[in-house]
Amino acid sequence: MIQKNTLLDVADNSGARKVLCIGLLNGKKSASVGDVIVVSTKVITPRGKVSKGKVYKAVVVRVKKAVRRLDGSIIRFSSNAVVLINDQGDPLGTRVFGPIKKLPFGLFSKVMSLAVEVL
C-alpha cells in the first residue's frame, strides 16, 4: 500500500537509491504491486543516470503489505521498492535487484526479464 509521501527504495541500477511518491496514476488513494506512480528522487549515487529532485515514473515491484494469491499463499516483502521507467514503460536501469512479484501480463515484460527472481 503506497500512498503519497511514501519513501521507497529503488530496485534498479539507474542511480537513484531513495525516491518519494508524489502522485498515483491509478486513480486511487493507494498503489500496490504493478501500479505506476510518479516519484521524485531524494537520494542518488554519483555518476548515475538520474538527477536529484527530478520527477520520474516508476512501477511498484515490492510492498510490505501481504498480498494473497489465488491459491491461498501469501507473499510479503521486507521493503517497499520500485523500478524507474520511461514514458514507454521500459526501465531506466539495466539490472533489477532482489526478488519481485509477478507483474500484470504483458505490461512490464522488460522489467520482469531483468529481474533475478520473480515470485
From Swiss-Prot:
Q: Which gene encodes it?
A: rplN
Q: Which Gene3D superfamilies match?
A: Ribosomal protein L14
Q: What does this protein do?
A: Binds to 23S rRNA. Forms part of two intersubunit bridges in the 70S ribosome.
GO terms classed as biological process:
translation
List the CDD domains: Ribosomal_uL14
The record's keywords, sorted A to Z, are: Ribonucleoprotein, Ribosomal protein, RNA-binding, rRNA-binding
The record's family statement is:
Belongs to the universal ribosomal protein uL14 family.
Quote the cellular component terms of the Gene Ontology held in the record. Answer: cytosolic large ribosomal subunit
Species: Ehrlichia canis (strain Jake)
Its ancestry begins with: Bacteria, Pseudomonadati, Pseudomonadota, Alphaproteobacteria, Rickettsiales
Q: Assembly and partners?
A: Part of the 50S ribosomal subunit. Forms a cluster with proteins L3 and L19. In the 70S ribosome, L14 and L19 interact and together make contacts with the 16S rRNA in bridges B5 and B8.
InterPro entries, per the entry: Ribosomal_uL14 (IPR000218), Ribosomal_uL14_bac-type (IPR005745), Ribosomal_uL14_CS (IPR019972), Ribosomal_uL14_sf (IPR036853)
Question: Which Pfam families does the entry mention?
Answer: Ribosomal_L14
- The name on file for this protein is Large ribosomal subunit protein uL14
The entry lists its GO molecular-function terms as: large ribosomal subunit rRNA binding; structural constituent of ribosome
